[in-house]
Amino acid sequence: MEQFHGTTIVSVRRGDKVALGGDGQVTLGNIVMKGGARKVRRIYNNQVLVGFAGGTADAFSLLDRFEAKLEKHQGNLTRAAVELAKDWRTDRMLRRLEAMLITADATTTLVITGNGDVLDPEGGICAIGSGGAYAQAAARALAENTDMSPREIVEKSLEIAGDMCIYTNHNRIIETIE
């Protein structure tokens, strides 16, 4: 059975501000199944932002597990991500999940990959999903050459990705921590 997939999630950190945004398109093969999905959320008492890309059911499974790790480690983002990655590498069921997460709190942004890796993005900019490369390139150019806020950079990056990637639409949800 073919999986639901296709999205763009991008995060930009500048100083003490971070924005995380994503589009709303859910695709099954070459059919748009939903245009207004919410793939970016606030969790852990609104202190942590998370965005997910990949198979929808897999992403929700990982999100649930990540929230449990955050609770267990009292909101310590890095510790929760590393513990999730350890589980991901050792649990046979988790190893088959095809999804990625970007997580951010007031001080840290992390990418949790489908291989169970935890990455701290260079320059505070990262993106995942089918339109991730477009969004990340746009965000990097905007961050290096403008005074735009993280939210504005995320918005424009998602717009550019939506113009270029057939699996990304212009329904955007953006969350910030300032």
Swiss-Prot record:
One of its GO terms (biological process) is proteolysis involved in protein catabolic process. Na(+) binds at G162, C165, T168. One of its GO terms (molecular function) is threonine-type endopeptidase activity. It is found in: Cytoplasm. Pfam families: Proteasome. Allosterically activated by HslU binding. Its EC number is 3.4.25.2. One of its GO terms (cellular component) is proteasome core complex. It is an enzyme of class 3 (hydrolase). It catalyses: ATP-dependent cleavage of peptide bonds with broad specificity. Its main location: cytoplasm. Keywords: Allosteric enzyme, Cytoplasm, Hydrolase, Metal-binding, Protease, Sodium, Threonine protease. The keyword Cytoplasm applies. The active site is at T7. Signal peptide: none annotated. SUPFAM superfamilies: N-terminal nucleophile aminohydrolases (Ntn hydrolases). A double ring-shaped homohexamer of HslV is capped on each side by a ring-shaped HslU homohexamer. The assembly of the HslU/HslV complex is dependent on binding of ATP. Protease subunit of a proteasome-like degradation complex believed to be a general protein degrading machinery. NCBIfam families: ATP_dep_HslV, PRK05456.1. Belongs to the peptidase T1B family. HslV subfamily. This is ATP-dependent protease subunit HslV.
